């Protein structure tokens, strides 16, 4: 078998079999297939696509390119969730504790932030002492004991995806649905959970710009799950504006703590309750979503959900006093309110722009090796559908140094304010099974 023949074959819309896909993945991981040939193949896939069967076979070949996490020693159904990423997306910090407080077992491996989107690990590391590097043995023990652990991804998990993703990033082949789906699902399948809930986001702050593309991506990943006999479901949610009010690492942890106390933003709470109720049904702990939804509300109101977050922080070496008293989180020296120059209703709020502003303040990274400043970021006062008067605060900036005029202008450009009434947007479009 020759790689050049396979490139020609896909260029002419041929359908690969399992042996051909295995040859490609094995060869690229061991270095016998060079970047330039893999780049040509990825571009051919972008133009010609992959069938559902090809996508599933590609996912499995990638999944088995490295270590597979064995969670069989964890009692009960192991649930996992994955968000396709967005701005202000701190759902794992709320969802993990509420699901575990209802008896769910969530053994989660998370990633870091890159570009305008934040990463769960960066948020957790804003809690002093919190350790994301836990041995597999301790990880399994912790989930058995308290139902929850969130750790960093193993370096030996899905090496094929690491190599292919780095190549896609520099060859204009990122926004290809079969390649996105196989990248996400290979990591989720290798992580060993019994069920997967995907939160597929769309809009200006998300990977997928349109609802139509988000639905296609969700369905592609669900089909992969079915092929691999894994209960996979998806919520399709809007990222037309940031989720919740906080953007930035410790600011988002504080907001997650408030949500676990029942005082969080309505959109964040709604998404976590709906996603959590689907996960509890997947775990066979509840018969239907309504019952599960009530149980999740109950663990928030009786304090068990917050207690579960404290347990996880304590087990992973973090300082629990920060969860008990979020005022302890470091505040940067510059706290600046950005006020409205006009009266009206917020019609649009560019989530991606605000994510980039937070990154420029030091809260995110342009390259994977950069450090992040956990204390900086933004807290929104006004979101889509809110009425605003001249001089009212649109958002508050938390910064290390004087906020530049350029950043202030970028914030103003992120808001569109109109005279006529604006409806608050729908957050969750649908749940796909």
What spans do the regions from the language model cover?
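Short glycine/serine/threonine-rich phosphate/pyrophosphate-binding segments
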Residues: 87-96, 100-101, 108-109, 115-118, ...
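Active-site cofactor/substrate anionic-group-binding motifs, chiefly glycine-
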Residues: 49-110, 114
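A glycine-rich helix N-cap at a beta->alpha junction
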Residues: 123-149, 219-225, 229
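Alpha-helix C-terminal capping segments
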Residues: 47, 93-107, 187-192, 227-228, ...
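N-terminal glycine-rich anion-binding loops that anchor highly charged ligand groups
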Residues: 1, 10-73
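Phosphate/diphosphate-binding glycine-rich loops and adjacent basic-rich segments that engage nucleotide
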Residues: 144-193
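Active-site-proximal beta-alpha loop/turn segments in soluble metabolic enzymes
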Residues: 42-46, 123, 161-170, 199-208, ...
């Amino acid at each position: 078998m020759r790689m050049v023949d396979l490139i020609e074959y896909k260029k002419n819309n041929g359908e690969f079999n399992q042996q051909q896909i295995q040859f490609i993945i094995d060869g690229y991981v061991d270095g016998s297939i060079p970047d330039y040939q893999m780049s040509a193949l990825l571009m051919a896939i972008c133009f010609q696509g992959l069938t559902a069967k090809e996508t599933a076979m590609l996912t499995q070949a990638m999944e088995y390119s490295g270590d597979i996490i064995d969670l069989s020693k964890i009692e009960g159904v192991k649930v996992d969730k994955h968000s396709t990423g967005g701005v202000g997306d701190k759902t794992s910090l709320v969802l993990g504790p509420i699901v575990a407080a209802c008896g769910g077992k969530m053994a989660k491996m998370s990633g870091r932030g890159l570009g305008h989107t934040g990463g769960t690990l960066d948020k957790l590391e804003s809690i002093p002492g919190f350790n994301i590097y836990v041995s597999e043995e301790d990880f399994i023990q912790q989930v058995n004991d308290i139902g929850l652990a969130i750790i960093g991804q193993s370096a030996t998990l899905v090496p094929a995806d690491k190599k292919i993703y780095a190549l896609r990033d520099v060859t204009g082949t990122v926004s290809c649905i079969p390649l996105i789906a196989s990248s996400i699902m290979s990591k989720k399948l290798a992580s060993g959970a019994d069920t997967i809930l995907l939160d597929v986001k769309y809009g200006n702050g998300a990977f997928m710009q349109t609802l139509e593309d988000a639905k296609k991506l969700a369905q592609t990943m669900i089909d992969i799950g079915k092929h691999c006999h894994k209960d996979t479901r998806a919520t399709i949610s809007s990222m037309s504006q940031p989720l919740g009010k906080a953007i930035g690492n410790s600011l988002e942890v504080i907001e997650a703590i408030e949500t676990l106390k029942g005082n969080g933003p309505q959109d964040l709470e709604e998404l976590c309750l709906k996603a959590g109720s689907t996960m509890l049904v997947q775990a066979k702990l509840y018969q239907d979503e309504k019952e599960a939804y009530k149980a999740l509300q109950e663990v928030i109101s009786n304090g068990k959900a917050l207690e579960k977050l404290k347990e996880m922080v304590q087990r992973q070496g973090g300082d629990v006093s920060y969860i008990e008293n979020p005022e302890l989180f470091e505040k940067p020296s510059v706290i600046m309110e950005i006020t409205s120059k006009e009266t009206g209703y917020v019609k649009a709020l560019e989530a991606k722009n605000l994510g980039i502003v937070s990154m420029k303040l030091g809260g995110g990274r342009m390259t994977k090796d950069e450090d992040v400043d956990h204390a900086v970021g933004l807290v929104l006062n006004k979101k889509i559908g809110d009425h605003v008067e001249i001089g009212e605060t649109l958002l508050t900036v938390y910064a290390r140094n004087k906020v530049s005029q350029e950043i202030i202008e970028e914030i103003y450009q992120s808001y569109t304010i109109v005279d006529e009434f604006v409806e608050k947007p729908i957050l969750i479009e649908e749940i796909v099974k």
